[in-house]
């Protein structure tokens, strides 16, 4: 009995030592997992870094092209035109809001005929006025920018709802009509645009856009026409 009691503490110490040894043996396995995870994470992050670099490169090219734009023309009538169109749109909205009131008052005054007449007059000034102003001012170029990197021009016009419309073109895309229409200086892809030559910062841009730097074409028909020669021979 005394021998068993003496061996029990030693057995406890032996079990503790075995536990520590087993823990030390499992450590390399954990280290392998950690090292494998550390090797796989950079491989997974490589596509993300590539996408970020690609996005940054595309963004940098866009900013460079935007910064390269030079304003060479500014329409002095642009602020007044915006104010007039804004006032017209506001009065049109007020006219739409007043339509039920006009209808009610017309029914009280003269019945259905008077109500239709008042609504027609109110609707005419509500819809026709902003459309007429837009028809006159839609060709007016408020700003004209030039990109020396691509040698392209960007013309800015105003839409019906006071939004900017940008038209990018090159001098080869410009067509100057023989008989210019009302408020039309040149055509870009069959779209008329109007500019004031005196408002250009550099007149050379206007000369380049209008094609005045090219040789003059007198449109002389110097090619022989066989039909005309036949008719002249028959007369002789």
From Swiss-Prot:
Transmembrane segments annotated in the record for this chain: 83-103, 116-136
Record localization: Mitochondrion membrane
Keywords in alphabetical order: Membrane, Mitochondrion, Transit peptide, Transmembrane, Transmembrane helix
Membrane topology: Multi-pass membrane protein
InterPro entries: TMEM70 (IPR009724), TMEM70/TMEM186/TMEM223 (IPR045325)
One GO cellular component term: mitochondrion
Organelle targeting peptide span: 1-64
Pfam hit, one: TMEM70
GO biological process, one term: mitochondrial proton-transporting ATP synthase complex assembly
Assembly notes: Associates with mitochondrial complex I assembly intermediates during its biogenesis.
Function: Scaffold protein that participates in the c-ring assembly of mitochondrial ATP synthase (F(1)F(0) ATP synthase or complex V). Also binds the mitochondrial proton-transporting ATP synthase complex I and may play a role in the stability of its membrane-bound subassemblies.
Family that this chain belongs to: Belongs to the TMEM70 family.
The protein's name in its UniProt record: Transmembrane protein 70 homolog, mitochondrial
Lineage per the UniProt record: Eukaryota, Metazoa, Ecdysozoa, Arthropoda, Hexapoda
């Amino acid at each position: 009995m005394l021998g068993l009691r003496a061996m029990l503490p030693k057995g406890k110490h032996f079990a503790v030592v075995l536990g520590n040894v087993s823990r030390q043996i499992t450590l390399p396995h954990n280290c392998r997992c950690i090292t494998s995870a550390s090797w796989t994470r950079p491989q997974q992050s490589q596509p993300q870094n590539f996408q970020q670099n690609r996005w940054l490169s595309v963004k940098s090219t866009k900013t460079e092209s935007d910064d390269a734009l030079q304003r060479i023309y500014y329409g002095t009538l642009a602020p007044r035109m915006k104010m007039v169109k804004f006032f017209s749109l506001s009065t049109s909205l007020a006219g739409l809001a007043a339509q039920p009131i006009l209808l009610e008052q017309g029914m009280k005054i003269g019945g259905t005929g008077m109500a239709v007449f008042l609504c027609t007059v109110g609707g005419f000034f509500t819809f026709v006025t902003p459309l007429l102003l837009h028809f006159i001012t839609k060709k007016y170029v408020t700003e004209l920018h030039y990109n020396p990197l691509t040698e392209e021009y960007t013309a800015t016009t105003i839409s019906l709802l006071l939004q900017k419309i940008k038209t990018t073109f090159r001098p080869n895309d410009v067509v100057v009509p023989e008989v210019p229409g009302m408020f039309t200086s040149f055509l870009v892809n069959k779209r008329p645009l109007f500019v004031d030559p005196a408002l250009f910062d550099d007149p050379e841009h206007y000369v380049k856009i209008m094609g005045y730097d090219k040789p003059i074409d007198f449109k002389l028909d110097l090619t022989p026409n066989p039909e005309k020669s036949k008719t002249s021979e028959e007369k002789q």
